[in-house]
Amino acid sequence: MSGIIFGCIAPHPPLLVPSIGRGQESAVQITGDAMKKLANLLELQHPDTAVIISPHAESAADAMGILTAPRCTGDLQRWGDRSPARIFANDIELASAIRKEAKTSGIPTRSIDSDNYELDHGVMVPLHFLERSIEGVPIIPIAFSWLPLQTHYDFGKVIGNAAKQQQKRVAIIASGDLSHKLSAQGPYGYDPMGPVFDKRLVDDLSKLDIEDILTMDDVLIERAGQCGLRSFLILLGALDGLKVKSTVLSYEGPFGVGYMVASFEIKRGE
């Protein structure tokens, strides 16, 4: 089977990494345990390529960003981790196919072609848990835009179509956190719409109610102070037309920020 063979949602708090958390990772133990389960699920899929969407990538308002350079590097040293930078190969063939398919679909993209492109923590924190499951597999970092939500879903379809055309087995990892306004202790204070947003999104993803996600009120999204919605919609678009088992492996909201881990397994032979 080629095309999208697995999808997942992963949060990216740096303190999930023990060398950064230095004991504080116990406050997100539920999330850490779920990430280990996610790694086990991903390892079973044997992808050829992993597409990783990060809210903290080098973004532009009016175009999706796609790394087209042959390699990229990443570390978490700015967060206190002393591990050396990791080097990852990029699947430039599939990246080119995604850009071509996007152009055909009328979705603007831009090439990120820096030979020294540095992966952000939105990529590196999930990879701390998932890298062993995709060892030696090239990755394609993606940056979303501020184009409409529907455009992000449609861009996900583009990724799925390109994966099929290239006959690649592709796993897609959507990095993102939910509301940052769950409590007064959060980074942006409390807004009652924060918990409302998180409950609705977790429920919608459990049921794969994509229409409800796409029609979320702009005010709700803004007041929630979230960062992952567009990443998630690209993932959901990539799964369009497939029979999918959606499982929310965990959700918790310590530090006033919502963290969710979810898997999207393709049902085969049905």
Sequence positions of predicted segments:
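Short gly/pro-enriched beta-turn/loop segments at secondary-structure junctions
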Residues: 134-137, 165-169, 175-176, 257
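Catalytic metal-binding/acid-base residues of hydrolase active sites
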Residues: 56-58, 178-179
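Non-transmembrane, aqueous-exposed alpha-helical and coiled segments at domain scale
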Residues: 157-164, 170
